[in-house]
Amino acid sequence: MNYINAHGTSTDANDRNESKAIRTVFGSHADALMVSSSKSMSGHLLGAAGGLEAVITAKAIAHGVVPPTATLEHPGEGCDLDFVPGSARDAQIDVAISNAFGFGGTNAVLVFRRYDG
């Protein structure tokens, strides 16, 4: 696991809880993960957000470029991961996930793996 396209709504509660969940699931490996939110560039597209973010995650793997959290200046309290602030980062991504958390508890995590075949 190299990259997470976070749900990342830039709200204190969501970002703090998502960061905590990433640390809970990945333990010490969380420090090695690149985490960004494509919503920082597109805004929240409501029902279309999950689909677009899945495409962005797959394209990040295919092109070896992690999209930035473009507008991040100061992460909130409890948000201490590598949020790829400011500009994109070249990186080989073997496995990535895209988080999508919907209103009313409809939540999904899609896992993508690079295919070299």
Question: Could you tell me what each predicted segment is?
Answer:
Residues 2-117:
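Conserved "HGTGT" condensation-loop signature of ketosynthase/thiolase-family condensing enzymes
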